[in-house]
A protein has these predicted regions:
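A short alpha-helical cap/connector motif
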Residues: 1-252
Length: 252
């Protein structure tokens, strides 16, 4: 199973986007007056989406849907939206995990995905991110933070240390192909029950048509994991893609 486009689908998307381009992220790098005011996705839209995800998973798994993992935190707007939604829905069992180096994109990002990324894109310090969350009425102390580059932090040692064993929602917003691949390899062994995977930059810069970025990483992941099937669900904006992941049951 995969979600690769055939030639007709590629051509159709190319023509459509020529006249209706996918919106770019509103901010990448450089100084801004107040980084906490930047919302790459409107918070209310994200809250509505997360509430929908919770309902989908609760129909399948019951009240305890599992933990929330976010890869690429930036100023905390996404993880803050999930936190507030979970509190509103009384998901007391859900834990929150934020994985980020808090230094923006790494240097090698410039050599990936048709050169669309630059070192330092989406940089927000850990201290500033905490301030942003406090201003959103989010208790950052109730979130588990894993700071560092993914090639150093996404490993079995941290799986055991964090006691990761039940995943509910995964928000992948780390942009590059290599980072998305590391994330998927990390969570793959944990996908033993239904979960929802959200790819924030699936169509950004038309990387899906170019067979790069998150599009490439996810399709390769599905190729390597035939025990998993994916069903696309409605996502929160045009540039993103979201999927319900289901382990294939062995009835033998």
């Amino acid at each position: 199973m995969n979600f690769r486009y055939n030639l007709i689908q590629k051509f159709g998307r190319l023509i459509y986007r020529k006249f209706n381009p996918v919106p770019r992220s509103p901010w990448t790098q450089g100084k801004v007056k107040d980084i906490c005011e930047i919302n790459l996705v409107p918070p209310e839209r994200l809250k509505s989406f997360f509430a929908h995800c919770i309902k989908i998973l609760q129909k399948i798994k019951g009240k305890d849907i599992g933990d929330y993992l976010e890869f690429g935190v930036f100023n905390g707007s996404s993880i803050g939206s999930m936190y507030l939604t979970a509190k509103k829905e009384n998901l007391e069992s859900m834990r929150f995990f934020g994985f980020d180096a808090f230094q923006g994109l790494p240097k090698n990002a410039e050599n990936e995905d048709d050169g669309v990324w630059k070192k330092g894109f989406y940089a927000c310090s850990f201290d500033k991110m905490q301030e942003c969350l406090k201003r959103r009425d989010v208790n950052y102390k109730q979130i588990n933070w894993v700071k560092g580059w993914y090639n150093k932090t996404l490993n079995s040692k941290n799986i055991n240390k964090l006691k990761l064993n039940k995943i509910g929602i995964v928000f992948i917003d780390c942009d590059t192909y290599s980072s998305a691949k590391l994330v998927l390899d990390f969570i793959g062994p944990l996908l033993k029950e239904e979960a929802i995977l959200c790819f924030d930059d699936w169509k950004l810069n038309d990387l899906d048509i170019k067979e790069m970025g998150e599009y490439k990483a996810f399709n390769e992941f599905l190729d390597k994991n035939p025990q998993l099937q994916a069903e696309e669900i409605k996502s929160y904006n045009r540039k993103s893609k979201s999927f319900l992941i289901k382990p294939i049951k062995n009835n033998i």
